[in-house]
Amino acid sequence: MTTKRKIIGRLVPCRCFRGEEEIISVLDYSHCSLQQVPKEVFNFERTLEELYLDANQIEELPKQLFNCQALRKLSIPDNDLSNLPTTIASLVNLKELDISKNGVQEFPENIKCCKCLTIIEASVNPISKLPDGFTQLLNLTQLYLNDAFLEFLPANFGRLVKLRILELRENHLKTLPKSMHKLAQLERLDLGNNEFGELPEVLDQIQNLRELWMDNNALQVLPGSIGKLKMLVYLDMSKNRIETVDMDISGCEALEDLLLSSNMLQQLPDSIGLLKKLTTLKVDDNQLTMLPNTIGNLSLLEEFDCSCNELESLPSTIGYLHSLRTLAVDENFLPELPREIGSCKNVTVMSLRSNKLEFLPEEIGQMQKLRVLNLSDNRLKNLPFSFTKLKELAALWLSDNQSKALIPLQTEAHPETKQRVLTNYMFPQQPRGDEDFQSDSDSFNPTLWEEQRQQRMTVAFEFEDKKEDDENAGKVKDLSCQAPWERGQRGITLQPARLSGDCCTPWARCDQQIQDMPVPQNDPQLAWGCISGLQQERSMCTPLPVAAQSTTLPSLSGRQVEINLKRYPTPYPEDLKNMVKSVQNLVGKPSHGVRVENSNPTANTEQTVKEKYEHKWPVAPKEITVEDSFVHPANEMRIGELHPSLAETPLYPPKLVLLGKDKKESTDESEVDKTHCLNNSVSSGTYSDYSPSQASSGSSNTRVKVGSLQTTAKDAVHNSLWGNRIAPSFPQPLDSKPLLSQREAVPPGNIPQRPDRLPMSDTFTDNWTDGSHYDNTGFVAEETTAENANSNPLLSSKSRSTSSHGRRPLIRQDRIVGVPLELEQSTHRHTPETEVPPSNPWQNWTRTPSPFEDRTAFPSKLETTPTTSPLPERKEHIKESTEIPSPFSPGVPWEYHDSNPNRSLSNVFSQIHCRPESSKGVISISKSTERLSPLMKDIKSNKFKKSQSIDEIDIGTYKVYNIPLENYASGSDHLGSHERPDKMLGPEHGMSSMSRSQSVPMLDDEMLTYGSSKGPQQQKASMTKKVYQFDQSFNPQGSVEVKAEKRIPPPFQHNPEYVQQASKNIAKDLISPRAYRGYPPMEQMFSFSQPSVNEDAVVNAQFASQGARAGFLRRADSLVSATEMAMFRRVNEPHELPPTDRYGRPPYRGGLDRQSSVTVTESQFLKRNGRYEDEHPSYQEVKAQAGSFPVKNLTQRRPLSARSYSTESYGASQTRPVSARPTMAALLEKIPSDYNLGNYGDKPSDNSDLKTRPTPVKGEESCGKMPADWRQQLLRHIEARRLDRNAAYKHNTVNLGMLPYGGISAMHAGRSMTLNLQTKSKFDHQELPLQKTPSQQSNILDNGQEDVSPSGQWNPYPLGRRDVPPDTITKKAGSHIQTLMGSQSLQHRSREQQPYEGNINKVTIQQFQSPLPIQIPSSQATRGPQPGRCLIQTKGQRSMDGYPEQFCVRIEKNPGLGFSISGGISGQGNPFKPSDKGIFVTRVQPDGPASNLLQPGDKILQANGHSFVHMEHEKAVLLLKSFQNTVDLVIQRELTV
């Protein structure tokens, strides 16, 4: 406004003095929050020449505006225009038009009438094509169409002969029209981020071209024809797949900048020396083994970057580069430098990081202008004395964790040559790389790595008992596991943040840093404080000012403490690419199933390999080793890929993650320690600089189980990685609590059992370990409730943008299955052995948990989960479990469970049965590595789709603020039963810092308490919770202590209308879980088992509804920042609480109740599996909350052009925090329409619900915003309708097999099949209601369920088909399940608040009602046969349009099956979810046997008990053909609401 006034003031002097009115020619209304063009503009329509309306909210241009005939410049960028009116043709004098960052979908044909147009800026609009009339704008000189949806240009585009600048970045162009050769005046052409597979032929005919961008395409060759562009000055060919550069490139005589970064070059042509004017040459991140000698001819070269290659020597001619100022040769294999290097006297910055230098030439002292020299991660024993001549040297990096730029050097005599040399305590350097790399190469997952890299600031500490921590605080132990760290290496010194761009390889640095040398504990260098500081987990949580590198401190108790403090400044590009490359190479190698103890050796062996590749990307070999050791080699590799379980690590500063284990775990501690070391190393790898993917790798590793305890520890570590990932995902400080790592908790192995926290049963540990195998490694929050919050900021601080670049693809691929917070269950866990240990819920929902599970969500192979498990068979088991419930023996499918079926059961039940045992909140995130891998692929190909909007990417991080998650914690508990609390604990510790601090509401103190094994905490949790209130920026404004019973209402009121609005705004696409890709819904992410049925059930239940909401939030989280999610969740939760209270208050309603709760648990598991029934509601909640936030149009949310626009500027950017994390509103925009379903109520719990998505439960959530009664009514109504529709199937639906939790049900079945019957009997009355009219049924269910479960009403988070355990399971669980369910439901309630349970109950009841359930538990196959269709849909992981629901469909061959399939491992992919390698139905014969049962897009999860999740296409076809007449399919369908 001030600008406007200024201009008007300037142009309109007081009329008193002027006899006539001043001529107004310029009006500027920029940034005035206008919703329409001000009317006063029309007063000057005769004289107005320039009108600026930038950055307002104008949705349409009034007709009067086009009467301004004199208008020459019209600037309306960053508004809400959806179209350009045809009346624009009347602006015949218009010369400049700027409509960028709007929602304009096309130019009107008659824009051709604006003959004077010379500049058109229309970037960041969904323009799919240009009208023919556009080519008649013959005066056009500048055209900017970046970030549109153009797939082609008009054939006569060459008519625009006056074009000088043409920018078409970030479109979908594959070719250029041949007429473009007429653009003789074209000087700048930007074709970056398109889909060119080869250089367009027409390019070499545009002779006047001076600047050409072709980066981020799919070029494989740089043809010689480019040499015809004699005027070319700037050429960017980076991020393609170029393998060869033609000799004729030398024809570009004027070329000054040549960018070939991130390609696949193995050599450069000698003719490159003929580019005499070259000043910048970048060939980093390729596969060069040598440089041509002719490079010395580039006498004007000022910047030369050949980092991240495979160079073993530099040519001596490099001495001729007298103009060179910057030389980067990082991450190569140089054993020495040529003496001629001293002739490069103008070099000011030289980086030689991560090579194999053992000495430096004396001539280096001649480089008098050298100011920055990075020698970290080499093998130097000393420095030449000539270094004393470098008077301008300001920074000398000798290690990655160096705390000061310059460290004093002492003069010494060389022992052998007696020459004077310079040394200091950092010599001799220990190569970090060799050992570290080995392990990495095997289990290393590129995608995970990338994520981890982004996560590079994570710190994972494993502490034994606090006492031990305190005692050993100052001591650094070298563990054999620490091999990567070099036992003899000196203590770690924190190194300052890297110089501008130098990236330190995480491992090497860490290793080096962790050298024998004692670490000066008081040394300021240790930013975190002395290693002893490690003990102070909280302090550890504090962000490290220095660039912390992942360092592994031998943990005090012989555990390794891994601190990933390194912040690598370098963004994804080169390092990441290199890392990816290395990783890919590594991944290619089979992972060794190495023991943790062996991991060092493994690491070494792998390291060598890795070193080769990873030198540039040092991975924590340990990490791989860990994985390897836990997982079987071949599988391991895949597992790494599958590691998707690792949540993508947003690019947040790593948090300190405390990997805590119960004492029990410590029993295996030695092994565990090793494992931990490995894990830690893995973690460090995970946290390492380039560790974005690494983190996920680490997480994957976490899955690996060394021993149950080890696994736990490992899991803890991995989980910590997970947590880190997640934490980055959910940066928001959950509680005031410091990160778990910060917390006082001791390393899981070492952690003494706190009185509060009971050690998890070994079984649980085993289970936990199993859980770790799953992508969704549970994170068990250590008891320390308050610790996470502090570290959260670190996570949150991680720049989203960092991850956003490559992240999006990852996110898409990753689906974080709900991460339940498993309350660590104390000894109480040992509930009746009779109970079948539930399969790890994590497993279930994580990766392969349920055949119904969205495979896409867990693209990684089911094997992955099992692979991670100590037993290779595990994979198969899991698969089996997914395939057939029966395979789930009392735990076989879930190996760990199997180990301690009782325990796992007890874990689950113990939560129910013993509240004394506080549950540990564990977050389990499952990310399929494959999902992640796409990102890697993208990175590798250097191709980032611009379609990946930053928002979406941003979504990757969850910013979760302290949302009381007591309920969640409870939910976790149930999870815990599957996942070992220990494991969970480990992860939670490792991850806890993450989970807690990061974003998991479950990290709430109370939540944590639940999650933690502390009984007292549980109680405490039940009593009070801290709720954070967030400001508009979603920054926690403070925490409020809330009693468990009543939660503080979220800052925003639930506004059903608003929610609906939000949902409206949300684009389904955005919403799809894929869109949320990397992030599991918060609720799921934080599923908390209720600590104990009795104590916390009510509280938990109350919070459970919130939790459920949280779930949806989580999902939204993927899009929304954790804080926003938290806010939403809070908002939703409080409303839901009342219903929860109603239903939840009586947490222990009875067997039925429990069963329903079990159902809930299962549903949660299912959710974890990727069915987010709750999530959807959560989404809805999110939407509703979004309502509270300004919601931008999808278009607004569109990503900005990479170059031209800031991420924020576009659309949602306003609402979205700068971090690029999409705001709640943005998320809401992206929330799947499913969420709308949420509005109508979550009744789906009913069998009908089972059939239909429980999405209605979301409705309930919305209801949460409305009066509880309304919600119930709505839910009932919906349910009644569903019941009517699905009544026939309801009983059938109940089949466990049908339930997504098939695995779980199997587990339960294993535990006690009797439950089915019992349940059935218990549910009989409910059954009757089901039999009644649907509406009646729903009422009955509501009532009964209400009675039974605290959330009698359908909770906003209905149990997805997946969420709800199969009836069979429930019934099976019968008594146990009741207990289990009770506990789980309590947990669920706590997390979902009773409503969820209610939903579950209803669903369960429905399921129970159907007799099928019992069968189903026996085997999924069994369930399959049951009803023609078991709509046990569970929320699918896809959130986009609908909820993926799972159905059982029985087809009778006649003569064939009547449908066609596509997809599969080796198939050509499917048109529905290209990233999903599952088997999809592509065509259904209209009259065929499947015509009424299947529809295109259905994903086949099972057929007659055979899992189709990771199956070869041919095998699937053969199987289907080989079946007899009846084929029972378990399919997943995205139901649109």
UniProtKB/Swiss-Prot annotation:
Main location: cytoplasm
List of residues that carry Phosphothreonine: 831, 865
Protein name as it appears in the record: Leucine-rich repeat-containing protein 7
Family: Belongs to the LAP (LRR and PDZ) protein family.
PANTHER family linked: DISCS LARGE, LEUCINE-RICH REPEAT-CONTAINING PROTEIN 7
Modified residues (Phosphoserine): 439, 441, 443, 850, 869, 947, 949, 1118, 1233, 1335, 1439
Gene expressing this chain: LRRC7
Comp. bias regions, Low complexity: 790-804, 859-871
Subcellular locations according to the entry: Cytoplasm; Postsynaptic density
Tissue: Brain-specific. Isoform 3 is ubiquitously expressed.
Residue numbers carrying Omega-N-methylarginine: 1149
SMART domains: LRR_BAC (SM00364), LRR_SD22 (SM00365), LRR_TYP (SM00369), PDZ (SM00228)
Biased composition (Basic and acidic residues): 663-676, 872-882, 1243-1263
CDD domains: PDZ_densin_erbin-like
Disulfide bridge positions per record: none
Complexes and interactors: Interacts with CNKSR2 and DLG4. Interacts with CTNND2/Catenin delta-2. Forms a complex with N-cadherin through CTNND2. Interacts with CAMK2A.
Domain PDZ: 1445-1535
Lineage: Eukaryota, Metazoa, Chordata, Craniata, Vertebrata
Gene3D superfamilies: 2.30.42.10, Ribonuclease Inhibitor
Keyword Repeat set for record: yes
Polar residues: bias regions: 677-709, 1332-1354
Source organism per UniProt: Homo sapiens (Human)
Repeat region (LRR), residues: 23-44, 47-68, 70-91, 93-114, 116-137, 139-161, 162-183, 185-206, 208-229, 231-253, 254-275, 277-298, 300-321, 323-344, 346-367, 369-391, 392-413
Keyword Cell inner membrane: no
InterPro entries (alphabetical): Leu-rich_rpt (IPR001611), Leu-rich_rpt_typical-subtyp (IPR003591), LRR_dom_sf (IPR032675), LRR_R13L4/SHOC2-like (IPR055414), PDZ (IPR001478), PDZ_sf (IPR036034), Synaptic_Scaffolding_LAP-MAGUK (IPR050614)
Origin superkingdom: Eukaryota
